Every structure is written in structure tokens, then in C-alpha cells.
């Protein structure tokens, strides 16, 4: 790190620039969402681990998605809740870099996991006879580990580039956590290399994965329409539509934040988009999968039935 960079030992997170009453209202509301996120994704993990009927590649990837959602929420929301109670709460430089790394790592990994889930559905519906041969447990574990590794390595590259920059001027981050773009605005040097790497990452993670998902689901839709059984067609539509809802919410909010012209979205509006990306999406994901997925609802009924009989 540069000589001047050591002058900044902590940052101030400004959070939401609102009145005290509104901040207390948001604290209560966001606390409920936070609890629902942990309980909902925790329930998904519990059902998948306890019900042997859900020990399939599809739910293996879903369990990883639930882990990402829990981890992402734990990384950002407690800091946001603390800022609502105590505005302009400081965070150490090391803590800020750690939060940035984890945020990017979980976000990148979720992008890749959503692609893996769409590929799993593509193989299951378009090549059902070869499904067990293609989607072996060895393949699934390798793909999941690869998604986590790629996400972590790229996040590490971002943080290493940030550590090369001097931070000796303003130390107020106009956000509720150490989001990478907000941190870069405080650097006392040219950040063109950081911006190039961020743009390349956006192309790789926010253009490539949605394109692959759309290609997969175009084949899936064609295959579903050829299914003769009405029950089979309904089950396939139910499973795939839940995944498409999650994909649309996640990538839609991420693309608006990182790829839309910044002049159209002021900083305060960017914070609202980040709420959808890092807060509401993890809350909605278990609801979408439980309400629109018959197998998950069946597993929940069986689990509740065992509890009532015990």
C-alpha cells in the first residue's frame, strides 16, 4: 500500500440519509426481512438435508444458493441495521476490504450457481435418459466448487487492485456497506484499471450467465411443449418458472446497478437497487421455491407430519 494510504484507518458509512423516525421504521422492517431471510433459507437447507427425495442435483445446487443468500445477507445487513440505529457508523479499513471481498465473492458465485441450475434443468428436461450419466455427483460437486472458487478469485483480484490505491482524502462512504464503486470514489488516484476490471467482470457475470440461461430455457420451453402428459408439463413449468423468477430478480437488479448509465440513477437511488440485489432477493428466493415448487412443499408437509406424530 502507498505511504499516504495508511492515513485512513477507517471509513464512515453514511447509510440512508433520512430522518430519525423513518430510520427507526426501516430498522424494524429490515430486521423482519433479515429474520425471514435466515429462517427461509435455513428451512430450505434443512428440508434438503433431511428429505432423501430432495437429494438430487437440482436441490444440491439450490442448497448452495441458500448458503450464498445466507452468507451475503449476514455480510451486509447487520452493518446496515447498525447504521440505522447509529448513523455514520465507522468501519475499519481492514473490515471494509473484507466486506467488499465477501460481497463480491458471494455475488459472483451466485451468478454461476444460477447458470448451473439452469443447465441442470436443461439436461433433466431435454435429455432425461442421459441425466443420471451427465449430472453425476462428482460433476455436481466439481461445478459447485468451481463456481465458489471463480467467485472468490475474481473478488480477490478486485480487492488487491483497491489496496494499490491511496486513500488519504474523504473517508465517508455514501452507502450502507462497503460497496466497491462507493469505495473507489474515495481513492486519491486514477481508478481506470479498477473500472476496466469491473467492466470485464460485468460482461462475464452479468451478460454471459443470463445469455446462457436464456439459451437453456429456450430449449427447455420447446421440450416442455412437446410433453404429452399434462401433469408432466405442469410439473416442468412449475419448477422452471420458479428458477426464472429468481434469475430475473437477481440479474435484473444487478444489471441496473452495474451496467446502466450512472447519470440515470443517483447515489440514493442506487442504494434502493442494492436493497433488491442484496436484501430482498435472498428473502424472496425461499418463498419463490417453496410456493411454486411441489417437491419442496411436499417435503415441508412430510417434515411437519413427522413433527406432529413424534
Swiss-Prot record:
Residue numbers on the Extracellular membrane side: 1-24, 79-99, 158-195, 259-271
Disulphide bridges: 96-188
Transmembrane feature ranges: 25-48, 57-78, 100-119, 139-157, 196-218, 236-258, 272-291
Keywords in alphabetical order: Cell membrane, Disulfide bond, G-protein coupled receptor, Glycoprotein, Membrane, Olfaction, Receptor, Sensory transduction, Transducer, Transmembrane, Transmembrane helix
Any single Pfam family the record assigns to this protein: 7tm_4
Role, per record: Odorant receptor.
Record-given protein name: Olfactory receptor 2A1/2A42
Originating organism: Homo sapiens
Organism ancestry: Eukaryota, Metazoa, Chordata, Craniata, Vertebrata
Amino acid at each position: 500500500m502507498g505511504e499516504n494510504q495508511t492515513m485512513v484507518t477507517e471509513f464512515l458509512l453514511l447509510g440512508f440519509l433520512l430522518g430519525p423516525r423513518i430510520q427507526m421504521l426501516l430498522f424494524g422492517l429490515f430486521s423482519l426481512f433479515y429474520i425471514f431471510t435466515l429462517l427461509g433459507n435455513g428451512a430450505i437447507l434443512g428440508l434438503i438435508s433431511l428429505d432423501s427425495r430432495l437429494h438430487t442435483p437440482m436441490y444440491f445446487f439450490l442448497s448452495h444458493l441458500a448458503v450464498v443468500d445466507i452468507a451475503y445477507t449476514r455480510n451486509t445487513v447487520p452493518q446496515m441495521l447498525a447504521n440505522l440505529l447509529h448513523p455514520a457508523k465507522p468501519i475499519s479499513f481492514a473490515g471494509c476490504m473484507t466486506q467488499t471481498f465477501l460481497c463480491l465473492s458471494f455475488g459472483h458465485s451466485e451468478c454461476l450457481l444460477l447458470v448451473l441450475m439452469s443447465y441442470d434443468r436443461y439436461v433433466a428436461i431435454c435429455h432425461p435418459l442421459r441425466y443420471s450419466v451427465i449430472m453425476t455427483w462428482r460433476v455436481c460437486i466439481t461445478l459447485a466448487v468451481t463456481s465458489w472458487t471463480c467467485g472468490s478469485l475474481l473478488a480477490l483480484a478486485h480487492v488487491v487492485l483497491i489496496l494499490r490505491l491511496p486513500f488519504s482524502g474523504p473517508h465517508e462512504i455514501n452507502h450502507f456497506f462497503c460497496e466497491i464503486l462507493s469505495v473507489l470514489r474515495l481513492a486519491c488516484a486514477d481508478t481506470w484499471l479498477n473500472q476496466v476490471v469491473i467492466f470485464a467482470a460485468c460482461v462475464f457475470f452479468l451478460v454471459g450467465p443470463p445469455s446462457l440461461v436464456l439459451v437453456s430455457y429456450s430449449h427447455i420451453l420447446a421440450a416442455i411443449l412437446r410433453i404429452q402428459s399434462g401433469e408432466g408439463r405442469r410439473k416442468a413449468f412449475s419448477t422452471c418458472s420458479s428458477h426464472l423468477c429468481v434469475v430475473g430478480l437477481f440479474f435484473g437488479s444487478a444489471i441496473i446497478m452495474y451496467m446502466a448509465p450512472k447519470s440515470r440513477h443517483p447515489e440514493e437511488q442506487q442504494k434502493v437497487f442494492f436493497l433488491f440485489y442484496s436484501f430482498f432477493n435472498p428473502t424472496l428466493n425461499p418463498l419463490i421455491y417453496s410456493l411454486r415448487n411441489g417437491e419442496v412443499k411436499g417435503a415441508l408437509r412430510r417434515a411437519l407430519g413427522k413433527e406432529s406424530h413424534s
